[in-house]
Amino acid sequence: MLTRLFSEPGLLSDVPKFASWGDGDDDEPRSDKGDAPPQPPPAPGSGAPGPARATKPVSLRGEEVPEPTLAEVKEEGELGGEEEEEEEEEEGLDEAEGERPKKRGPKKRKMTKARLERSKLRRQKANARERNRMHDLNAALDNLRKVVPCYSKTQKLSKIETLRLAKNYIWALSEILRSGKRPDLVSYVQTLCKGLSQPTTNLVAGCLQLNSRNFLTEQGADGAGRFHGSGGPFAMHPYPYPCSRLAGDQCQAAGGLGGGAAHALRTHGYCAAYETLYAAAGGGGASPDYNSSEYEGPLSPPLCLNGNFSLKQDSSPDHEKSYHYSMHYSALPGSRPAGHGLVFGSSAVRGGVHSENLLSYDMHLHHDRGPMYEELNAFFHN
């Protein structure tokens, strides 16, 4: 059919010849992409479109194809331009976001009257919860202060001190239950006052009727203290005190700090010549008059002044008398046994008995005295 159409002379008269196409290519300049050689025209009847610079596209039947109008071209250009602008705007936004950090958090909304009311109500509820919580905490701490072994009408323990003391108290009670033994008073107070401040330590010691100066807590002790908890009757004074009058061989034979049966008030042993007198008096090497529990009590280390031992104590108006025990009571005929009178008499003092064995009458502080000390005081003065 195609051969039949092209064989008709009426149809081929309007179609330009192929030779004229080849001649026209040499005269016209090449396009910008003219590196590629010109394409030959398609074979007749193939249906492929010709080159773009063809004069008029012709259909197979010889009809002209209508060219696109100007409006259509403008619409296509506008659509393409809008797409390019959108891409450029997106790229610009990405670059701007990369340069400055993004704003985080919720966006601020406009505060309305209803929102203000809700916010105020929430704040009031939160304040009420916090107030009730603090009231409950204070009530619980007050109940805890009534249980711990520290009471004062004028001073109130702080919250942290109350909790620390309660922790130490629980620990001390658990140790008592574990060992099954009654603890020493000094070690018990040291356990209670571990990590506490000095005012709280003084309160605890006062409640337990113990002088706070007689034990060293962690704040003031660097390792060595006057008290070591337990270890015999001489645990209070584990070290000897140097004195020129104690350097004799006669007193050194007595055994240093004395035997285990000696009382805690005796910080060293007697001379060998007088140990037999105490043994004969029934004390077993210890003074018979100092084996009573009434003389129990904490003492500070004695001072060695001019060969004499004297106990350190606070001066008070009621205890200004510093006269010596043996010199004041040696004249009483029935106050001491015969053996004791031999040792503490004035002749014995002149004979060389060391005055460190003769304790001061006012050996206890005023606030450490109880009814038993008042009875002793009345006994000595009658």
Swiss-Prot record:
It is found in: Nucleus. Keywords: Activator, Developmental protein, Differentiation, DNA-binding, Neurogenesis, Nucleus, Transcription, Transcription regulation. It comes from the Eukaryota. Residues 121-173 form the bHLH domain. One of its GO terms (cellular component) is nucleus. Residues 78-97 have a biased composition (Acidic residues). The keyword Ubl conjugation does not apply. Its main location: nucleus. One of its GO terms (biological process) is positive regulation of calcium-mediated signaling. A motif (Nuclear localization signal) lies at residues 107-113. The C-terminal region is necessary for depolarization-induced and calcium-dependent transcription activation. Interacts with TCF3, TCF4 and TCF12. Interacts with CDC20. Efficient DNA-binding and transcription activation require dimerization with another bHLH protein. Transcriptional regulator implicated in neuronal determination. Mediates calcium-dependent transcription activation by binding to E box-containing promoter. Critical factor essential for the repression of the genetic program for neuronal differentiation; prevents the formation of synaptic vesicle clustering at active zone to the presynaptic membrane in postmitotic neurons. Induces transcription of ZEB1, which in turn represses neuronal differentiation by down-regulating REST expression. This is Neurogenic differentiation factor 2.
